[in-house]
Amino acid sequence: TFVPPSWRFHLGHSYYLLGRYGEAVALFREAIERAPKFRPSRMYLVCAFAEMGQIEDARDAAKSLLEAWPNFTSGSAVKFFPIRREEDKNRIIDSLSKAGLPKT
């Protein structure tokens, strides 16, 4: 059977939304390794680290995100990625801010 490499991102995203951040981090790292140009994996890795309180790791991941996407802001997250629930949008924006990324 064919299993696309993006399954790691999608499962990691699900774990992130469920608050299972450690599992999400592992999957986002694998997703980045397999598809380094897929920027959402990098963004959610930043968020997961921030939610776990691992701010230094979140900041390191944010630097990597900015290398891949130089003009990224938390506003980019809500503009480019479909985030329906307001509470999820706020959590993502807060996580990105904790990592030192600009809001606009």
Language-model features: where?
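Alpha-helical protein-protein interaction modules
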Residues: T1-T104
